[in-house]
Amino acid sequence: MAGLLGAAVVVGAARTWLIRAFRIQERDPRLAAPGGSETAPEGVAARVPTRRNRTLAARVFLPHPGRPVAVVVHGWGAGGADMLVLTEPLRRAGFNAVIFDARAHGASDDESFASLPRFAEDTEAVMDWLAARGLGPVALIGHSVGAGAVLLVASRRPEVAAVVALSPFSHPRPIMNTWLAAHGIRWRPVQDALNRLVELSIGHRFDTIAPVNTIKAITAPVLIVHGTADQTVPPWHAEAVAAARPDVPLMRLPGVGHDDTPGFTRHLDAVLGWLKGVVPG
């Protein structure tokens, strides 16, 4: 009995440590700032209901009535405000846009923890909010964890018109192992145990949410985009995802890093040119 109690204490302590370690410490509230209107360059603020009675802070840009909508998903620890740089290029390319803060990020409601599946749930909440207003078709653009989220959504939502995955990781496990090693946890059995604890905590096996697997179930056109100088999610991750679907193009961006907004901006015309070519409407 004492052994079981001791094990329970260790597991509980490890789970608490992981949750605290992954909590977003700084949150950018800019997305909630009042805007002009849905057709104005600055868009308009909105609150979108999502799971567990939470709401999301969103910014809605509808300069093109009846045209497709790009739903843009930020990465871990970032926020929708970091993706506002995309709104003007999207407008020029003929797209409407919605940018939002995932739960526990930016000006959205707090949550017990954030995870790739919850990013995906929030993306679907925005899609449902748009569908209730008769807006679409919807294309998804996601960065980093947001890229994994949009691939997961598209694997189970066939109405998605197209997906752009920016800097996706291939599988959560190597990302977690790298993070654990950076925190002094390098022994593989301990890494494996903590990875399993994360799976139990988020309610999903890593294999079921890994981009290298979810991309196989997507019927919509997909573009993978990755910077060759990405040190956070090294380029081999994108190579692995692309190898899982040889028909999916991989756009390599020379010298571009992970959170490299100027670098990505230099290549937006090519990325949005592809998107415009595959999305009807």
Where are these regions (language model features)?
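The serine-hydrolase catalytic nucleophile loop
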Residues: W76-P89, A102
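Hydrolase active-site cap/lid region
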Residues: L152-H204, D260
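Catalytic histidine-centered segment of alpha/beta-hydrolase-like enzymes
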Residues: V256-L268
